[in-house]
Amino acid sequence: MDAYEKIYQLYHLIKTKTAADLPGPYKVGVDLGTADVVLVVTDESGNPVAGSMRWASVVKDGLVVDFRGAMVIVEKLKAEVEAIMGITLDKGATAIPPGTVGRNALACGHVIAGAGLEPVCQVDEPVAAAKALDISHGIVVDIGGGTTGIAVLKNGELVFTADEPTGGTHVSLVLAGAYKIPFEEAEILKRDPARHRKIMPVILPVIEKMATVVKNMLAGYDEFNEYPVYVVGGTAYLQGFETEFGKAFGRKVHVPPHPLLVTPLGIAMFG
C-alpha cells in the first residue's frame, strides 16, 4: 500500500468500524487533539488495521487541559478497537506539538498510560505526519485545532521544526463572531462541506494568516524554497483551503486525502 492508499484504508476502517485481516504484532498511536481524539492500530509495516475517533475538546493550544476527560475518551476508543479486533492493546505512541517541554510534554504520555496503554514513544506531530506520507524530502505543515507545526525533512533526516499557536479553533471563533452563534455551533458549521463555499469569504483572512505564519517560520531558510509542501490537519478539509493557503503562502501546496487522519496514522507507525 502506498501512503494515500493507507489513509483511504484507515478512513474506511474507522467509518465501518471494522478491522483489516492483517497479522500482528501491532502498533498503536493516539492523537490527542484540540477538537478530536483518534486511536489508530497498524501492523508492523504501517498498514492500517483498525481505528476509532471522537470529537472532543480536551487539549488547548497543544496542552492537555482536561486530563480526566482525555483519559476516559482514550479508554473508550481503546475498548472499541479491542472489541473490533478481538485482542488487548497494551502499549502505544502519542505526539506533541514541536517545542513542547517539561510537564506539558509528559501529559500526553500520562493520559494514555492512565487509559491502559504503556507509552513507548512521543513524537512531534508534523514528524508523525511526514512518516505517514512517506516523505523523505519536503515540508509538512500540521494545522491542529490550537497549534500549527511544521517539520522539514532532507534526505530522510529532520532538519527543522517549529510551532505557533494558531489553528482550526481560530476559524471557529471567527465563524462564531460573524454569525453570532455559540462556538460549538461554529465547530459544526465548519465541518459541514455543504456550507464551505458560503463561509470561505468569512474565514479567508484566518487561512491567509495561517499561511503567513508558516511563511514567517521558514523565513531565512532559502534552501527550503524548492521543497514540496504538504498540509495536514482538520482545517485542510475546508473546500478551497488548498488553493487559498497556497496563494497566501506563495507556493503550491498539497493536501492529502482525509488530512485529519494523517498525523494519527503516523503516530501509530512510531508505536
Task: Enumerate the predicted regions with their spans.
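A structural feature that tracks compact, well-ordered secondary-structure segments
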Residues: 149-151
